[in-house]
């Protein structure tokens, strides 16, 4: 839904509808970290990061940021996202969704391969997602992840971000700042 000049209320309603849908779909999920915070916190953080980097209103992009894990993690179809929200939102979510039928190593490899071919808007979601995940690794790492595994995740996340063809400069600076904290692990 493209924002009209006096359509802030509709945009807010659309965002809240997406946030509620994401919250309901991810209700049973917790973050992997020791704090086991509700998964919706991650989705809200990704959307907030994208919002801070925008230079214009893009409600669909923010909705896609909120919904970016609904297909991959809880099986919401692209068709359902298109029906409930819009084809644009569904397409953005699809761009950042891994194929769960593949093994984890292949999914990770393909994120690097596909990164430069995604739209600029999808790249914003991708980098914001990586920022959020790295922040979690620093602030509340999963108890069952060794230091080596966390460092490998940081390295892989950097490979994905470095492969992006047009990373948003605000998000790239934020990513670089959190990546530098790798030495703090």
Regions found by a protein language model. Name each.
Residues 2-185:
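Active-site helical microenvironments for divalent-metal-assisted chemistry
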């Amino acid at each position: 839904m493209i924002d009209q000049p006096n359509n802030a209320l509709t945009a807010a309603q659309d965002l809240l509808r997406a946030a509620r849908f994401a919250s309901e779909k991810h209700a049973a999920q917790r973050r992997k970290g020791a704090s086991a915070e509700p998964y919706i916190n991650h989705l809200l953080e990704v959307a907030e990061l994208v919002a801070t980097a925008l230079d214009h209103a893009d409600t669909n992009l923010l909705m896609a940021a909120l919904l970016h894990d609904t297909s991959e993690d809880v099986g919401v179809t692209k068709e359902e996202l298109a029906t409930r929200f819009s084809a644009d939102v569904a397409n953005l979510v699809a761009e950042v969704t891994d194929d769960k039928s593949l093994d984890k190593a292949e999914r990770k490899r393909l994120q690097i391969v596909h990164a430069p071919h995604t739209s600029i808007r999808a790249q914003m979601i991708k980098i914001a997602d990586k920022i959020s995940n790295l922040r979690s690794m620093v602030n509340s790492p999963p108890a069952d992840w060794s230091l080596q595994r966390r460092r490998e995740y940081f390295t892989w996340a950097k490979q994905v971000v470095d492969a992006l063809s047009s990373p948003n400069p605000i998000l790239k600076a934020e990513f670089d700042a959190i990546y530098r904290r790798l030495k703090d692990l």
